[in-house]
Amino acid sequence: MAHEKLWGGRFSEPTDQFVEEFTASIDFDKRLYHQDIRGSIAHARMLGKQGILPMAEVEKIVAGLQEVLARIEAGKFDFSVALEDIHMNIEARLTEKIGEAGKRLHTGRSRNDQVALDIRLYLRDEIVEISAYLDMLVDSLIYQAEANLGVIMPGYTHLQTAQPILFSHHMMAYVEMFTRDKGRMEDCLRRMNVLPLGAGALAGTTFPIDREHVAELLDFPGVTRNSLDSVSDRDFALEFMGASSILMMHLSRFSEELILWSTSEFKFVELTDSFCTGSSIMPQKKNPDVPELVRGKTGRVYGNLMALLTVMKALPLAYNKDMQEDKEPLFDTIDTVKGSLKIFADMVREMRINAGNMRAAAAKGFSTATDVADYLVRQGMPFRDAHEVVGKTVAYCIANGKDLPDLTMDEWQGFSDKIGEDIFDAITLEASVNARVATGGTALERVKAEIERAKVGR
């Protein structure tokens, strides 16, 4: 069905069909329908309150918008490319239903401030949902940390065995990361949560509107302070996408570790069958597709951020059609982050830990060598000298096919006469782990305290 353009008065020729299709955004911005209608209802009520529209017309507008909303949610709304976007589709349908009053709804506003409002409302809701998914993932990490207290694994630097740590300590490291991610989301929400409606196209409006009343109706604590900035600003979307990129980086690092840990070479964890797939040719395969996909999707989120940064980097104030390109990368980022968090929260809770393999790996690679150096320092030796002594001890062990616990007392004292029988107690895995009692350390009591602190902070 052909639709007359709601802005067509200045034009004498119809829009080229390909131009119409090329410039339309309805295929992707239709997901903003609920926010668009909610914003329009608040705007209409304000127009009535201010005497700009008669209350009888306001009630017709509100009832009509609610009917449009019900029709969309029932899947009975025909979106039209000819009407370009969600705003015009809804307004045109409203006017068809209620007549002249529908044409008055747009009094005192522009699509420029209207879309700025819609995106903020939408993203505000999505950030709340993403924060809930972050809470679910943190809960799963805490669950694994509590369920596996005392399990010792190797800690790595450069992916080489470094020092023994608690598996629970490793899980709590990710609790810290995802807690920071939630904080970044909350910071983004705080800066974003102001009402742009009322800025008009760019300069404000000549009508005696009450922006603060609209803000109250839409649960915004305040309004934007400059009309040009209100319609030009996409910082809030960029900030969200930046925070999402960091969040996905954390998920990607975790994914890489789970992929490694689930290999036959590590065998530290087993992902349950419901989160893995098989091979079309190799019947023995159990592939960690979920963490692999999350790792891959991280680049997609980075790309979305770069895409929007590039769109915005040279735009003069105020609105430009380029800014229509904000929605697809934003929506894709939202969908990717939500999906990744939801599946990760479930997968982490259900994964199985192989404590025996973790402990066996922690006992290899001279993981307690630093403890020998610390032992010598406590006997009065300068740390650099202790480092040299232990380095030579490790070299001797490698040459002779031994590990540190295999050395005899005579061999130990051949490297330093400061070493006594108590060295053997100092280099057990438990002694190494539990010696690290400073705040942030991997000692069992310290990790228990951090788990409780994280639970209280939920």
Swiss-Prot record:
Entry annotated with the keyword Lyase: yes
Pfam families: ASL_C2 (PF14698), Lyase_1 (PF00206)
Regions crossing the membrane: none
Catalytic activity entry: 2-(N(omega)-L-arginino)succinate = fumarate + L-arginine
Record CDD domains: Argininosuccinate_lyase (cd01359)
Any one Gene Ontology molecular-function term assigned to this protein's record: argininosuccinate lyase activity
Protein name (Swiss-Prot/TrEMBL): Argininosuccinate lyase
Compartment list: Cytoplasm
This protein's pathway: Amino-acid biosynthesis; L-arginine biosynthesis; L-arginine from L-ornithine and carbamoyl phosphate: step 3/3
Organism of derivation: Geobacter sulfurreducens (strain ATCC 51573 / DSM 12127 / PCA)
